[in-house]
C-alpha cells in the first residue's frame, strides 16, 4: 500500500518539474508558420495530394520563408528564387543532407549510394567513382548505339500507328523509351521484350515507387513505430526489400557468369563489378554498395504516366516535327 501512495505523490511532482523544464527551455528562432497541435504538429493540416497548393497558400500568408512542425521534425519551407539560391548554391553544403526516412534507408541499403547517403567522406569518394567511371562523357558516349537503336524503335512504332490510323500515346512511348534505355545501359537487358520478366520488373518498380513516397508516422514521431507495424507497412517494406534484393542478386550473378553471352559494350553492372575488385580507392565496394546503386537506376527507369511532364511531351512532339520536316 505504501508504494502506490509514494508513486501517487511523487509522479505529479516530477510531471510539474518536467513541464517547468520545457517552458524554461529556450525555443529556437524560427521563421513564422502555422500553429500546430501537440506532438503531431502540422501533420494533420497537410494533404499530400494537394501539398504544392497548400504550401503556396502558406507562403502567401507567412512570406517566402516559413516553418512547419512535422511531428517532432522542424521544417523550413522556402518559396522564392532568391532564398532558393541562398540554400541550394551559397549554402549548399549546410543543406546537402537528407532526412533519414525508414523506406529510403531500408531500400537504399542504409544510404550506400550517393542519393540518400549523408554528405561525408564516403559520399565524396562514391561521387568521385561515379563521375570518373560511370557518368563520364566517354562512358555516356559508349552507349550512343543503344540510344539510337531505341529511338529508331520508337519511331517505327509511331509510324506503324500512323499507317494504320491508330492513336499514339506519347506518354506511354516516352516512358517505355526511357525505361528501356536505362535498363539496357544499367543491366544489359531489354525487359520490354520479356513477358513474365517484364511483368515482374514493372511490379517491383511500382511497389518500390509507392514505398518511397509512403508516409511512415515513425519517421516524424519516433515512438509510434507500432502504428506502422499495425498498418502492415513494416511487413510490406521488408517483403519488397527481399524481392528487390533477390532481383539485384540475379542481375549480379548473371554478370558474373563466365558463360554469359556478352553483347559487346560493358554495361554499368560490369563496371561496378570491376570497381569492386579494384583496391585503389579509399572505400572497398561491396555487393550492398552495388545493389544500392542499382536501386537508384531501378527507380529512375520508371516514370508513372500520371506524373509525366507535359513539357517533356511537347519537346518530344517538337523533335518529331523537326524529323518529319527535315
Where are the regions that the model predicts?
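Short hydrophobic alpha-helical segments that form membrane-spanning helices or hydrophobic packing faces
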Residues: 39-46, 87-88, 305-314, 324-326
Amino acid at each position: 500500500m505504501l508504494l502506490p501512495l509514494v508513486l501517487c505523490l511523487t509522479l505529479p511532482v516530477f510531471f510539474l518539474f518536467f513541464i517547468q523544464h520545457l517552458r524554461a527551455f529556450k525555443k529556437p528562432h524560427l521563421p513564422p508558420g502555422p500553429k500546430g497541435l501537440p506532438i503531431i504538429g502540422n501533420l494533420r493540416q497537410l494533404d499530400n495530394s494537394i501539398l504544392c497548393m497548400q504550401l503556396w497558400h502558406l507562403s502567401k500568408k507567412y512570406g517566402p520563408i516559413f516553418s512547419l512542425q512535422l511531428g517532432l521534425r522542424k521544417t523550413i519551407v522556402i518559396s522564392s528564387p532568391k532564398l532558393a539560391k541562398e540554400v541550394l548554391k551559397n549554402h549548399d553544403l549546410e543543406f546537402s543532407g537528407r532526412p533519414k526516412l525508414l523506406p529510403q534507408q531500408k531500400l537504399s541499403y542504409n544510404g550506400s549510394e550517393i542519393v540518400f547517403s549523408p554528405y561525408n567522406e564516403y559520399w565524396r569518394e562514391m561521387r568521385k567513382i561515379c563521375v570518373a567511371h560511370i557518368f563520364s562523357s566517354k562512358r555516356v558516349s559508349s552507349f550512343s548505339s543503344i540510344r539510337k537503336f531505341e529511338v529508331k524503335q520508337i519511331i517505327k512504332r509511331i509510324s506503324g500507328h500512323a499507317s494504320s490510323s491508330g492513336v499514339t500515346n506519347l506518354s506511354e512511348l516516352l516512358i517505355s523509351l526511357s525505361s528501356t534505355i536505362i535498363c539496357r545501359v544499367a543491366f544489359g537487358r531489354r525487359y520490354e521484350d520479356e513477358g513474365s520478366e517484364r511483368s515482374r520488373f514493372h511490379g517491383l518498380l511500382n511497389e518500390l515507387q509507392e514505398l518511397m513516397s509512403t508516409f511512415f508516422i515513425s519517421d516524424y514521431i519516433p515512438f509510434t513505430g507500432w502504428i506502422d507495424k499495425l498498418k502492415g507497412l513494416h511487413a510490406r517494406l521488408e517483403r519488397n526489400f527481399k524481392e528487390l534484393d533477390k532481383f539485384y542478386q540475379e542481375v549480379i550473378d548473371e554478370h558474373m557468369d563466365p558463360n554469359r553471352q556478352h553483347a559487346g559494350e560493358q554495361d554499368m553492372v560490369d563496371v561496378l563489378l570491376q570497381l569492386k575488385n579494384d583496391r585503389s580507392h579509399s572505400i572497398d565496394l561491396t555487393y550492398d554498395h552495388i545493389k544500392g546503386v542499382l536501386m537508384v537506376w531501378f527507380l529512375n527507369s520508371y516514370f508513372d504516366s500520371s506524373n509525366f511532364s507535359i513539357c517533356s511531351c511537347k519537346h518530344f512532339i517538337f523533335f518529331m516535327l523537326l524529323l518529319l520536316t527535315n
